[in-house]
Each structure stands twice: as structure tokens, then as C-alpha cells.
Amino acid sequence: MKTIFALSSGRPPAGIAVIRISGSAAADTACLLTRKKIPEARRAVLRNLYDPDSGEQLDQSLLLWLPAPKTVTGEDLLELHVHGGRAVIDAVLKTLEKLPDLRPAEAGEFTRRAFENGVISLHEAEGLGDLLTAETASQRRAALMMSGGALGRQISAWQDRLLALSGQIEASFDFAEDIEEDETESRQHLAVMKDKIAALIAEHRQFENRPTMERLRDGLRVVLAGRPNAGKSTLINALTGQDIAITAPIAGTTRDVIEVSFALKGIPMRFSDTAGLHESDDLIEKAGIERAQRAIEEADILLWLGQAEEAPKTDGEVLVLYPQIDLPERHPIPEKIDIAVSAVTGEGIDRLQEKLVEIGKKILPKEDEVTLNRRQRQLVKEAADSLALALDAEDMLIIAEAIRQACRCYDRLTGKAGVENMLDNLFSRFCIGK
């Protein structure tokens, strides 16, 4: 397997750039570049870097030599901390390309080697991928929990309990001829075992029923809807603090769904400004209204700017808003209103934002709970379904097989088996150098 290299720090220019080299040729590379022996392990040293062919000095670098297996990839690892100018980085990378047994790393290849060498598990790699794409505080916390091994610890706890049950079953097979157990004792033993399995299933179902990491990544779907010129565009600008939608006193300014992602107190949200709902013969406007209706159907929260009895049906929560309360003609405020707001004066905006955050915390994953992605949730479900077969069984062989099937799901969760077809997709999400 060839040794790989890549720029592992951010884009230049920068104060310092870190170039990472991983593989069996890392030590020889250090000697070639510095014209000196390999330095002491895990101790940063200052070395001049040279082009082995021309002898030209490339830079003065802080060099860190990390021998396998205690490295981030499980392989010999060399880090070059060079000056972060583009010319310096380009010169070092071009020199590395010319060296034997070296090639540029592909996206996520350092992390993939860490997984293949047993440094991290599959779910930890997935958590790291989510951490790299996290844009809000809640996404960051969930990804850190996963990459820190929270799911692995839960799986290990489940496995230990199943292995204990499996050991009891094996013992009953081994000593069946030597120990006579009356029917009452046998049924009691089976009932206790099934109670333990039922408790495990209940724990699996709790994980299965939680919102997924994809749900957290996509954010809360908040849709603003109402009749034309109801103040939707002005309100979305006020809610996000951005100039998202065109506002004008002319009805029908918005003809399509305008979306913007925004975080309120760390809660990711995707706001959608929609076309005003009314009868129209204009083909373009009708298309916009149809898209608005689809957005309403998919909304987690519908902010309805209109009369409560006219609010569309949706599976999500509906907040009836009464906008433009800065205008005298908008008073008195009618009943059946959740929040009265003014995008001009800001009245009611803070209250509306607090309400959105409150609902978001109920819908999105909780910060103190392990958040699974769809693949992980499906495997937890399959493990629970396998264990459920044991609840109706009277034969210990069937129960033992149900436990084995559940354990195979755990192996797929951690990446010990049956995951080759999804690895390329996972690691392609990583940047080069990670």
C-alpha cells in the first residue's frame, strides 16, 4: 500500500500549514527531505526541507515523527508544519509527488486508513464526518458525542448483556444431560430470560424512535404562509436578520418558495417564504402557489399569517400570527391569535423566536442523547426485530439464533462486518487531508 500525503490544515494563506504523510515510506521521506536521520519519536524538531533532486531549500519546518501504531491512522506518520504561504505549500507538495512510493491522498483517506487499522470504529468515523459538516452548536454537540464513542459504549453494553444470555443458553445445552430441571424451573428460567430480552428490545426501540442525525442536519422546516401581501417576506427578513426576500406593497411579489437556513440559539432551521395563497389564472403564479402548498404539507412549523379558521391542514405545528401591528388599522387584535408581531418595530419577534426554539427542542434530537443516522437506526431496528422473535419462542435454539442475529447487527453498526458497499460513500464526504 502506497504512502499518502496531503495538506491537512486549512486553505492558504495562513500562518502555519500542516502537511501529513502516512504510510511505510514516511520515515524515509523525512530523511530525504531533511538530509538527516529520523528524529526522536513524538518530539517536535526544527529542520530545513530540501528538494532531493535539485538540492534547493524549500522551507524551514517543524517536523513531528510518529511511529505506528499509536497514530491517528495506525500507520507511521510524519507531519510537516511549514509556513502557510501558497508558494511554500506548493513547493513541498510537488516535491512529495516526485518521491517514490508516495501519492496524493484521496478525500477521507486518512480517516479510512484509521478505520481499516482499527483506530476508530465505523460509527466514530460517521460522527467525525458529521462534525466536519456541522454548522450549528446542536449539530456539533451531536457529532462530538458520536465521534467520541457514545454509540460504541452503548453497543458494548448491549453486547455484554446478550453474551451473558447466550452463555446461559450454551450452559443449558452442555449440562442438559447431567442436570435434571423440572418443568416449573425450566419455565421460570425461560421467563426470566425473556424479561431480560424484552428490556433490551425496549431500549432499542427508544433509540429507534429518536429523530435522526439527518433530521438535525436538515434542520426544522419553518414555512411562512398566508394570502398575498400578508407580510410574509418582511417577517422572514426580520426573523433571520437577513435581506432574504424582496418586499413591496404590491401583492404577489413572491412567486416561488424562497428558502434560507438559519440557526436560532443553536437550533438549525430552514425558513421558507411562500407565494400568497389565492385563486389565480396566471400560470407562473399558480405554479408558485402549488409549491407553497407542498411546502406547507412538509412543514414542521407553519407560521400562518391570516385568520385562524383559514389555516391550511398540516401534520406540523401551526402558529397563527397577526402581523403589521405597528399599523393603527390593525387594531384591535382579534382573538385566536398565537402571537402578534411587527417586523417594522420588532414587537413580538423575540417571543416568536423563543417559541420556534421551544418547538425545535421537542422535534429535533436532544443534546444529551446519542443521535443515530438512518443507517444506524435501521440496524438498531433490525437487532430489536431479531430479539423480538425470541419472545414467542419456546425452543432455546431459536432464542440463541435470535441473539446471534442481533449481534450481527451490532457488528455492522461498528463496521466489523457487512459494510464494504457504504464505505466509499462515507469517506467521500470528507475533505482531502482528513
From Swiss-Prot:
GO CC terms for this protein? Answer: cytoplasm
GO term, biological process aspect, one: tRNA methylation
> What remark does the entry make about the cofactor?
Binds 1 potassium ion per subunit.
Q: What is its main location?
A: cytoplasm
Under InterPro entries, the record lists: G_TrmE, GTP-bd, GTP-bd_TrmE_N, GTPase_MnmE, MnmE_dom2, MnmE_helical, P-loop_NTPase, Small_GTP-bd
Amino acids binding Mg(2+): 233, 254
The GO terms describing molecular function are: GTP binding; GTPase activity; metal ion binding
Task: State where (6S)-5-formyl-5,6,7,8-tetrahydrofolate binds.
Answer: 20, 79, 119, 434
Cofactor(s), by name: K(+)
**Organism domain of life:** Bacteria
Q: Where is the TrmE-type G domain?
A: 219-361
Is Metal-binding there in the keyword field?
yes
- One Pfam family linked to the record: TrmE_N
According to its UniProt record, the EC number is 3.6.-.-
Known role: Exhibits a very high intrinsic GTPase hydrolysis rate. Involved in the addition of a carboxymethylaminomethyl (cmnm) group at the wobble position (U34) of certain tRNAs, forming tRNA-cmnm(5)s(2)U34.
- Family recorded in the similarity comment: Belongs to the TRAFAC class TrmE-Era-EngA-EngB-Septin-like GTPase superfamily. TrmE GTPase family.
* HAMAP family named in the record: GTPase_MnmE
What does the annotation say about its assembly with partners?
Answer: Homodimer. Heterotetramer of two MnmE and two MnmG subunits.
Question: Would you tell me the protein name for this molecule?
Answer: tRNA modification GTPase MnmE
Originating organism:
Zymomonas mobilis subsp. mobilis (strain ATCC 31821 / ZM4 / CP4)
Gene behind this chain?
mnmE
